[in-house]
């Protein structure tokens, strides 16, 4: 079989302007970037505001493993098969961060014959949205550091006299806003800034990866440009000596930060291998942020398509949970059905049983033990009140006996249905049965339900998420988190939803606990207010907001020839 890159290069692409017109966009609603991608102007969203909505399908997965479950492959494959069945369909996915592209995970365009193309353009830069987020974020960091420098240098009276601005009285070490970069770089997690003469008061800070920026979450959750501007104004950049928050609006930088992101608020239109439209927009990680593509992209797609297929990052305890309790809560766009991706290899890896055998080799004991993880995720999705279809992403090494056993086992669960998917090797022909089952699932009566109401106390939300969302026996708060809980509740932020920042490699907080962990307590070390994004992040265990590169990073495979052809992506 050809490599992902070769398949992408040999694809016969539609001119993006023609594809956009077929999709229902007007010429002046597309800002073309060559013939392969285009920004979608928000005038399209305004024009389509009263259109009837299509069906929204959310793709999730079992607990991820190093072998890859094929969630994006299934998302794109399902989209292609829905199109092949005569439906008007659109995929909505996140823009890949270059951190994972050059780290371990690789690209995020799908794979095989279920790809968004050209894949190298998607995986590297695209239309520059992540760079815009980085630049806007770092302007905020430069602005608050500069304000601290000038206020310290001049004092209150002289500062207000010379600048015509209010004295913010920023507390020493009161700056909360880190800088960001779109790479994995662990040495930047903790730094000292402002060192040296005339460089401002020194303070401890750090870098996060851009995908973890609150600005990225704002981009993904905003309903329109005005909403994004209002949310950016609420960003908490620092605190003053009295402990009160200093916002981007207080600093006077919110307008400029939004201006940098004026084009980033527009989704990017690309296409799948069989010419189905795909909107790529925003890229928050699901372990350290809320892990879903944008509300704006979903809104536009739902007004133009019969079916919209999107995905949440990692397993159903991560991106899917946050899709429901954060994204759908804020947007009001509820899914009609969910697709839960699994593989034989994933179940064996999640069995908790050690074995020297090849993960591809038949192993009924490990398969049966790992099935508990799949069943947990089925029940987890079902508790939100929507039908769930299990998609078994088939690999060439899978045996019919194990596949048949798994299909029969799923029949005894709460799943609406279970189908094999061979989209990777067969493209649109490989997921037709899956598409038909998903279409039937979308017609089922359902009542989308959130895990907790807005008015629930913040501590109760944490407990509910841990106990019901993960199966824990409870939560434990560090002393710092206890104080933060009191402060956030006193300031009136208790009605916000919770975004758990935890490992994706286990349903629990501990990546070593496989299968369906029991009897564990979720340790919350810190609570962080994201006033602009509209949620509170609970940092759990040892999760980091700046990843590091591994021993054998992905960039080792990437190169470019004299002809300009890039190799090693995917």
From Swiss-Prot:
InterPro entries hit by this protein: Formate_THF_ligase, Formate_THF_ligase_CS, P-loop_NTPase
Keywords, in A-Z order: ATP-binding, Ligase, Nucleotide-binding, One-carbon metabolism
Catalytically driven reaction(s): (6S)-5,6,7,8-tetrahydrofolate + formate + ATP = (6R)-10-formyltetrahydrofolate + ADP + phosphate
Origin superkingdom: Bacteria
GO-annotated molecular function: ATP binding; formate-tetrahydrofolate ligase activity
Secretion signal span: none
SUPFAM superfamilies: P-loop containing nucleoside triphosphate hydrolases (SSF52540)
Protein name: Formate--tetrahydrofolate ligase
Lineage, broadest ranks: Bacteria, Pseudomonadati, Pseudomonadota, Gammaproteobacteria, Alteromonadales
């Amino acid at each position: 079989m050809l490599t992902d890159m070769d398949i992408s290069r040999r694809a016969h692409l539609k001119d993006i302007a023609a594809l956009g017109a077929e999709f229902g966009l007007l010429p002046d609603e597309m800002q073309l970037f060559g013939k392969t991608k285009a920004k979608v102007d928000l005038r399209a969203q305004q024009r389509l505001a009263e259109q009837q909505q299509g069906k929204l399908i959310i793709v999730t997965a079992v607990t991820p493993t190093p072998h890859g479950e094929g969630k994006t492959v299934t998302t794109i494959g399902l989209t292609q098969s829905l199109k092949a069945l005569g439906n008007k369909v659109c995929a909505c996915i996140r823009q890949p961060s270059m951190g994972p592209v050059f780290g371990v995970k690789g690209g995020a365009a799908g794979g095989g014959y279920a790809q968004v193309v050209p894949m190298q353009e998607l995986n590297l830069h695209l239309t520059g949205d992540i760079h815009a987020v980085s630049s806007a974020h770092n302007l905020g960091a430069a602005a608050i550091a500069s304000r601290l420098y000038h206020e310290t240098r001049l004092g209150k009276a002289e500062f207000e006299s010379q600048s015509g601005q209010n004295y913010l009285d920023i507390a020493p070490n009161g700056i909360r806003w880190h800088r960001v970069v779109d790479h994995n770089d662990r040495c930047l997690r903790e730094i000292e800034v402002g060192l040296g003469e005339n460089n401002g008061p020194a303070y401890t800070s750090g870098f996060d990866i851009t995908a973890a920026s609150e600005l990225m979450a704002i981009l993904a959750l905003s309903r329109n440009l005005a909403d994004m501007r209002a949310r950016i104004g609420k960003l908490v950049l620092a605190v003053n000596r009295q402990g009160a928050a200093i916002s981007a609006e207080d600093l006077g930088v919110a307008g400029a930060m939004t201006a940098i992101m004026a084009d980033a608020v527009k989704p990017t239109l690309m296409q799948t291998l069989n010419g189905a439209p795909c909107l790529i927009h925003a890229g928050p990680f699901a372990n350290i942020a809320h892990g879903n593509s944008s509300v704006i992209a979903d809104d536009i797609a739902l007004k133009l398509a019969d079916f919209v297929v999107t995905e949440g990052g990692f397993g159903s305890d991560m991106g899917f949970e946050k899709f429901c309790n954060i994204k759908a809560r804020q947007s009001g766009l509820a899914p009609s059905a969910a697709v839960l991706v699994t593989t034989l290899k994933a179940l064996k890896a999640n069995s908790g049983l050690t074995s020297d055998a090849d993960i591809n080799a038949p192993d009924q004991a490990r398969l049966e033990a790992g099935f508990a993880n799949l069943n947990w995720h089925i029940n987890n999705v079902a508790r939100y009140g929507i039908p769930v279809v299990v998609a078994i992403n088939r690999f060439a090494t899978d045996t019919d006996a194990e596949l048949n056993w798994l299909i029969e086992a799923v029949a005894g669960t709460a799943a609406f249905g279970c189908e094999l998917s061979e989209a990777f090797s067969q493209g649109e022909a490989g997921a037709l049965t899956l598409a038909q089952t998903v279409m039937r699932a979308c017609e089922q009566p359902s009542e989308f339900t959130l895990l907790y109401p807005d008015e629930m106390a913040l501590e109760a939300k944490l407990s509910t998420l841990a106990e019901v969302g993960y199966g824990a026996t409870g939560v434990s708060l560090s002393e710092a988190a206890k104080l933060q809980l009191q402060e956030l509740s006193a300031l009136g932020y208790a009605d916000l939803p919770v975004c758990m920042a935890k490992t994706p490699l286990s349903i629990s907080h501990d990546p070593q606990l496989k299968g369906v962990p029991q009897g564990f307590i979720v340790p919350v070390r810190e609570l962080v207010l994201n006033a602009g994004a509209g949620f509170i992040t609970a940092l759990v265990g040892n999760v980091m907001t700046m990843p590091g590169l591994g021993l054998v990073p992905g960039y080792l495979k990437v190169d470019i020839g004299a002809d300009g052809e890039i190799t090693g992506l995917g």
